[in-house]
Amino acid sequence: KKGKGIMTTILKIDVEELKKSMLQRRPMKARFKLSMSEDKAYAYLLAAIMAEVEYRHRVFCSNEDMEKQLQEMAHWLTTPSSHFGILLCGGCGNGKSTMLKAFQQLLNTLHIPKPYNEGTYGIRVVDAKYIAYLCKNNYEAYRKLINVDMLGIDDLGTEPSEVLDYGNIYTPVIDLLTKRYEEQLFTIITTNLTPQQIRGHYGDRIADRLNEMVKKIVFNNCTYRTDKFATRG
């Protein structure tokens, strides 16, 4: 029993040393976080959404659903998480794209510096259909898009599943999501698909990877595309 205990201790030390050595060769990617309190992030996101709504010549009115969505977004952006992306999912016209674009404008306004004097943080936002278009018509630009530090994908599920180029069949969004999963790259996705529909549309492999990759924020509220952006609850 004593010998077994010694071997266990040695094995534990060896495992820890090996782990450290491997991590030095392949450092863990730092998760992007806003360096502020959750309450402050909430207020900043709220201001950004109000500005985005006004930009579209709409009238902003708060409601409980939106406040909950903002709280979840602010919490994820300011606290440690294994997820390196967000999935904003729900019905049509209920604020998912507005949330994504508001976050984009907030980053543009805050001018948060990247480490090692690499400029400031910003997120590129593209429509899912444009990803498929780019894959077929400008593959080099598509490859660069796959690897951007921060990417927003709007309307996941509206794009063609496959594109054909000179006899070659590509799956643009699946390939992009696979690469971003492997590299743990910051990704925000909006979609009208439910998690079950995502699994049916993209298959178990991508659905399982998305489960690990993103935190889900569900938009259950009704459409805002009425006379006002939202009505008071």
Summary of predicted features, one role per range:
Residues 2-82, 217, 221, 227-233:
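A short, basic N-terminal segment
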Residues 85:
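Walker A (P-loop) ATP-phosphate-binding motif of ABC ATPase nucleotide-binding domains
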Residues 88:
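Hydrophobic anchor at the beta1->P-loop junction of P-loop NTPases
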Residues 93-96:
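Conserved glycine(s) of the Walker
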Residues 99, 103:
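Hydrophobic positions on the alpha1 helix immediately C-terminal to the Walker A/P-loop
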Residues 105-121:
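Post-Walker A helix-loop "phosphate-sensing" segment adjacent to the P-loop in P-loop NTPases
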Residues 119-182:
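Conserved nucleotide-sensing/catalytic segment adjacent to the nucleotide-binding pocket
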